């Protein structure tokens, strides 16, 4: 098993990152370089989280071997009180040979740092640029990142001056490398504590509230009202941008030098707008150089950037609205089925996606009723209690991990108890669960961040390139300080434990933080205690209340604005539900009509074809007799009678449903004129 566990986890983490990227990104529409860069960033960050427990177990085994081979006096001063030297050290099942982990961590760490500080910011500006050529986009990206890179050089220069002025230090390459790592980890730890303080409280509370059916339904109504406002704003913004594009397209003719730029902008517009602009454009009129009303290339670049953003935002709000409708309909079905006497879950609308036959066989309506109406609320409550216990352990350990005698950090206590018995499976599971919980608290907060609709991770392939690159950049900055904080909680970091024990391979590549004592002995130890204040603020929803006072509507049960938005969202859901029910009723009527009269029409057509074949054969055998005109007259009369039968209206005829069917409108068969075309559609104003 030497190195096998490392190889299996490398493969598993790759497919995990690929699955998550497929859920949020769009492989077909987005650029390949964006997909590859984001996948690499997510993959490297997830690798650190999954491989670090293996590094901890291997380090504990190596410490045991050193303790056994050393003298008793040295073993007494070691990190853990060990048994006599006669005791044999057991090799862990996931043991990684010496020399592999340092190289592995060095490649992973420096690649992720190159992505987060150099490549991904440049690709962000490149993807957001509205230039029409590669050179123009690169120029825009360099200009935007000049201030960005200058800020980092200023911070690094400040650290460098501090070390150069201090006479205790002799500047060497390793120390310069340590200064750069310390600067990056300091910035990451500053943001990490803010996100962690929110996630430690919000994740258990969200699962506890998930057991409240009425709470989830009211919150869904609230989201519907806010999303409808955003959806209307996105549609209005798109209309304004498309109007500007139309004016530009009409002013710049086919032989204008900037016409290629206009064509590039038109390709980014929705299909219906492209067709509308194509009908209104007159390419036969030449442009006049004497006119001064033509837009410049700089204005076209700005317009191109606005088109990309508005189209993507409009598409995202449309998809999110459909997803929110499905969620609201399902929660309303759960509320109705809770009082069902049959104990079988009944859906108002059938799922539009085809269900798996295996899942459909086991997940019957009865099983679904017991899970949704009885078991799921209790499962969410138990899960919320477990997550709350984890949060308490993490908060206590963050406040006490600097104490080594006695050891107060609960995470360090659990690891040291397992270390004495060499229970490597327990050590790896405890390390993995702890760092996985920390990652969930931080990463889930990252996925929920929404900065003025400019950066937003949306599922169902609706995340734009800029947000994907920003998330990869943020992950690469947060993961290294997160892992260092975890090693501090377990006292595996020599800077925290104040011992000469063998460090982990991950800690060894970071260098000794003693070069910057005010960071190693001050910021890294006392700043994580701020998580207590952030948890208290999150528990009392101070941030939510402040945003609500600033005008950003948040879901608060005691707010009058929240009640108004809930009522508005409930009315919106009711209208959409009625519209969908009418659509399904129309489809059911069409289906019944086809089943009732489809066979009769087919038999009539077969009879007519057989009659025409007999008449044509009779006319061929009697070519000298003038009977062909009578045969044609009879055939035409028969065809007219059949067409009248086909065009007859059934008793439950609905003109709206028939005209909305694309199959009927595009079939190309004969459609009668007269009063049937002039009849107005029924129920045309019901949705107003």
From Swiss-Prot:
GO cellular component terms attached to this protein's record: membrane; plasma membrane
The keyword Nucleus is annotated on this UniProt entry: no
Keywords: Cell membrane, Coiled coil, Glycoprotein, Membrane, Transmembrane, Transmembrane helix
Location (main, coarse): membrane
Extracellular topological domain: 1-3, 54-99, 166-180, 403-426, 489-515
Keyword Glycoprotein tagged: yes
Cytoplasmic side: 22-32, 121-144, 202-381, 448-467, 537-688
Subcellular location: Cell membrane
Superkingdom assignment: Eukaryota
Membrane topology of this protein: Multi-pass membrane protein
Biased composition (Polar residues): 618-634
Residues passing through the membrane, by range: 4-21, 33-53, 100-120, 145-165, 181-201, 382-402, 427-447, 468-488, 516-536
Coiled coil: 222-254
Basic and acidic residues bias spans: 600-617, 635-644
InterPro entries xrefs: GPCR-associated_LMBR1 (IPR051584), LMBR1-like_membr_prot (IPR006876)
Biological processes per GO annotation: adrenergic receptor signaling pathway
Record: glycosylation sites: 76
Region described as Disordered: spans on this chain: 600-673
Protein family according to the UniProt entry: Belongs to the LIMR family.
Functional note: May associate with G-protein coupled receptors and regulate downstream signaling pathways.
Protein name stated in the entry: G-protein coupled receptor-associated protein LMBRD2
């Amino acid at each position: 098993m030497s190195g096998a566990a490392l190889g299996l986890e490398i493969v598993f983490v790759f497919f995990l990152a690929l699955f998550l990227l497929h859920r949020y990104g769009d492989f077909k529409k987005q650029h390949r370089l964006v997909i590859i860069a984001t996948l690499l960033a997510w993959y490297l960050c997830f690798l650190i989280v999954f491989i670090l427990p293996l590094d901890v177990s291997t380090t504990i085994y190596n410490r045991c071997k050193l303790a056994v081979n050393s003298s008793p006096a040295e073993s007494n001063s070691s990190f853990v009180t060990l048994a006599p030297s006669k005791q044999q050290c057991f090799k862990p099942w996931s043991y990684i040979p010496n020399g592999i982990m340092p190289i592995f961590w060095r490649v992973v760490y420096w690649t992720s740092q190159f992505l987060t500080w150099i490549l991904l910011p440049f690709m962000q500006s490149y993807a957001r640029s509205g230039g029409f050529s590669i050179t123009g986009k690169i120029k825009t990206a360099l200009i935007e990142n000049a201030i960005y890179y200058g800020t980092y050089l200023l911070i690094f220069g400040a650290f460098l001056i501090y070390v150069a002025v201090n006479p205790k230090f002799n500047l060497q390459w390793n120390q310069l490398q340590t200064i750069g790592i310390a600067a990056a980890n300091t910035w990451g730890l500053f943001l990490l504590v803010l996100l962690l303080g929110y996630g430690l409280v919000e994740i258990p509370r969200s699962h506890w509230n998930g057991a409240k059916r009425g709470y989830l339904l009211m919150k869904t109504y609230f989201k519907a009202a806010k999303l409808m406002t955003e959806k209307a704003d996105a549609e209005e913004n798109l209309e304004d941008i498309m109007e500007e594009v139309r004016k530009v397209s009409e002013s710049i003719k086919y032989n204008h030098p900037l016409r290629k730029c206009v064509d590039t902008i038109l390709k980014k517009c929705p299909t219906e707008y492209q067709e509308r602009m194509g009908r209104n454009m007159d390419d036969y009129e030449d442009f006049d150089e004497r006119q001064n009303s033509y837009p410049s290339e700089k204005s076209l670049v700005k317009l191109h950037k606005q088109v990309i953003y508005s189209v993507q935002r409009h598409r995202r709000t449309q998809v999110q609205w459909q997803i929110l409708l499905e969620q609201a309909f399902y929660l309303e079905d759960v509320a109705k089925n809770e009082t069902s006497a049959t104990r079988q879950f009944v859906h108002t609308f059938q799922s539009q996606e085809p269900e798996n036959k295996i899942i459909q066989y086991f997940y019957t309506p009865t099983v679904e009723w017991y899970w949704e109406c009885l078991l799921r609320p209790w499962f969410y409550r138990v899960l919320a209690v477990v997550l709350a216990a984890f949060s308490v352990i993490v908060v206590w350990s963050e406040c006490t991990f600097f104490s080594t005698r006695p050891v107060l950090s609960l995470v360090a206590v659990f690891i040291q108890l397992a270390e004495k018995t060499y229970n490597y499976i327990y050590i790896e599971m405890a390390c993995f669960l702890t760092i996985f919980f920390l990652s969930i608290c931080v990463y889930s907060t990252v996925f929920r961040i929404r900065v003025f609709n400019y950066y937003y991770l949306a599922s169902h392939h609706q995340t734009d390139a800029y947000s994907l690159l920003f998330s990869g950049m943020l992950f690469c900055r947060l993961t290294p300080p997160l892992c260092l904080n975890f090693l501090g909680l377990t006292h595996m970091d020599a800077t925290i434990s104040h011992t000469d024990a063998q460090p982990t391979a991950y800690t060894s590549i970071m260098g000794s933080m003693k070069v910057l004592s005010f960071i190693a002995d001050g910021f890294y130890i006392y700043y994580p205690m701020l998580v207590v204040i952030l948890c208290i603020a999150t528990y009392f929803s101070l941030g939510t209340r402040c945003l609500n006072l600033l005008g950003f509507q948040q879901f608060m049960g005691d707010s009058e604005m929240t009640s108004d938005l809930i009522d508005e969202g409930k009315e919106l859901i009711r209208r959409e539900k009625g519209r969908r029910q009418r659509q399904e009723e129309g489809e059911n009527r069409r289906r019944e009509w086809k089943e009732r009269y489809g066979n009769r029409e087919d038999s009539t057509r077969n009879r007519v074809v057989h009659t025409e074949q007999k008449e044509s054969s009779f006319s061929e055998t009697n070519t000298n007799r003038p009977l062909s005109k009578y045969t044609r007259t009879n055939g035409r009369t028969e065809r007219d009678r059949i067409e009248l039968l086909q065009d007859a209206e059934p008793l439950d005829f609905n003109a709206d449903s028939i005209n909305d069917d694309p199959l009927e409108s595009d079939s190309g068969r004969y459609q009668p004129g007269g009063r049937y075309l002039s009849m107005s559609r029924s129920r045309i104003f019901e949705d107003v």
